[in-house]
Amino acid sequence: MSTNEGSLWGGRFAGGPSDALAALSKSTHFDWVLAPYDLTASRAHTMVLFRAGLLTEEQRDGLLAGLDSLAQDVADGSFGPLVTDEDVHAALERGLIDRVGPDLGGRLRAGRSRNDQVAALFRMWLRDAVRRVATGVLDVVGALAEQAAAHPSAIMPGKTHLQSAQPILLAHHLLAHAHPLLRDLDRIVDFDKRAAVSPYGSGALAGSSLGLDPDAIAADLGFSAAADNSVDATAARDFAAEAAFVFAMIAVDLSRLAEDIIVWSSTEFGYVTLHDSWSTGSSIMPQKKNPDIAELARGKSGRLIGNLAGLLATLKAQPLAYNRDLQEDKEPVFDSVAQLELLLPAMAGLVASLTFNVQRMAELAPAGYTLATDLAEWLVRQGVPFRSAHEAAGAAVRAAEQRGVGLQELTDDELAAISPELTPQVREVLTIEGSVSARDCRGGTAPGRVAEQLNAIGEAAERLRRQLVR
C-alpha cells in the first residue's frame, strides 16, 4: 500500500490508496500544463483570503513570496512533479510548503476545493489556447486571401459532385475556403462569452462559508463574471465541449481544403504544383511528390472529431455536481489544441507555396459543357421559359457530344435547328470569360464581386484579430 503523500486528502483514511488506485488517479503527465494558471490563481486566492481577514499582512506577503519563488522555479524547469504527486495541485502545494513551511503553506487551501479550482484553471488555459489557435487560423485565411489576390482573373472549372459544372474564378474558389474559417473564428470570439465565467468561490459544490468574494477573484483573474450557481460552476464542462466542437470544425474545414489540394496536385488534375519544401517523396518511387501535409490534415480531422465525441460521451450521464469522470475532460481538449498548433502553420505554408497552373485550369474550364447553363440563361433573357430553355441547352449538349466538339463550336445552323431562339448572338456567352463576368450578383464569381469579397475578408480578418486580443 502507498501512503497518501502527494494527495490533498487524508485524515479519515487509516492508510493510503492502493498502488493501482494511485496510478489510475495520477494526472500530472497531462495537467502540469495548468501549473502557471494554478500559481496565478493562488496569488489571487491569497489576496481574497487576506481581504476576508483570514490572513495577516505578514502571512499574505509570505505566501506571495513563496508563490513567486515557486513560479520562477516552474518556469525555468527546476521544479516539477514527482511520481508521488497525484496532480498539478498537489505538486504545487508541496512546492509551496517546501518554501514557506506547512503552517503558512497549508492556509492557502482555505475556501478552495479542487473542484472549483480545476474548473477555473481549465477555463483560463482554454481562453488562452483558443487565441493561439485563432492566430493560426488567421494565417491560413491570410494565405488563401494572398493567393486569391495574386490570381484575380484565373478561371477554373467549378464542380459539383466532383463533375465539371460551371466556370468560376480561382480566387472565388479559394475564398470559399476562407469563409468557413472566418466563421470558426467568430465561434471562438463568441465562445469566450461563456468561458469567461469564474467558478472560483464555489468550493466543492455549495460555495464557501468563509466570507470570500467570488467577484473579486473573478476580476483579478480576468474573468467577466463569477458563476451564479456553485453546483453548475463545478460540474459544467459545456465550455470544454464547445471548444472541442470549434476545434473539430476547424479541422473539418482544413480537411476540405486539404482534399482540394490533394486532388488538384494529382497528375489527372494538374491544377497545382507542390513546393519541394512543403511536400515529401517516396522511399521507392523517385518521381513522387506527395501532399503529406494535406493528407495529415485530412487524417487529423478524424482525430479531433473523436476527441469531441469522446468528451461528450464522458459528460453525458454524470449526476450533479463534480465526479472524478471529469479528470478525463482535459486530455481530448489538450490534444485537439496541440494538433491544431502543429497543423495550422503547415497548412498556411502549404497554401502560400502552391503554384497554380492557370493555363491548364483555363483550358479545362469549358470541358464537360460547363457553358450549358449560360446558354439556357441567355434564352431566358430572350423571353424563353426556363423549362424550354433547359431542354434546348440539353439538346445543344447532346448535339455537341455527338460531334465531339464544344458548345461554342456548334454552327449557327446547328444552333438554330435546336431552337430558333438560338441566334448567333448567343456566342457572346459561350466563352468562359463571358460566363464568369455574367455572374455579377452578390456572392457571384464575376471579377468585380470577387474583388469586393476579397476586401471584405481582409476587413473581417482584421476585425477578428482585434477582438481576439485581451
UniProtKB/Swiss-Prot annotation:
Q: What molecular function terms (GO) are annotated for this protein?
A: argininosuccinate lyase activity
The principal location of this protein is: cytoplasm
Which superkingdom does the taxonomy of this entry point to? Bacteria
Q: In which pathway does it act?
A: Amino-acid biosynthesis; L-arginine biosynthesis; L-arginine from L-ornithine and carbamoyl phosphate: step 3/3
Which key words are in the record?
Answer: Amino-acid biosynthesis, Arginine biosynthesis, Cytoplasm, Lyase
> Per the similarity annotation, which family is this?
Belongs to the lyase 1 family. Argininosuccinate lyase subfamily.
Name the Enzyme Commission number(s) assigned to this protein: 4.3.2.1
What are the TM regions of this chain, as residue ranges? none
Q: What's an example GO BP annotation here?
A: L-arginine biosynthetic process
Q: Which reaction does it catalyse?
A: 2-(N(omega)-L-arginino)succinate = fumarate + L-arginine
Gene for this chain = argH
The name this protein goes by in its record: Argininosuccinate lyase
Q: Name its cellular compartments.
A: Cytoplasm
Q: Which InterPro entries match?
A: Arg_succ_lyase_C (IPR029419), Argininosuccinate_lyase (IPR009049), Fumarase/histidase_N (IPR024083), Fumarate_lyase_CS (IPR020557), Fumarate_lyase_fam (IPR000362), Fumarate_lyase_N (IPR022761), L-Aspartase-like (IPR008948)
Species name for this entry?
Answer: Mycobacterium tuberculosis (strain ATCC 25618 / H37Rv)
Q: What's an example GO cellular component term for this entry?
A: cytosol
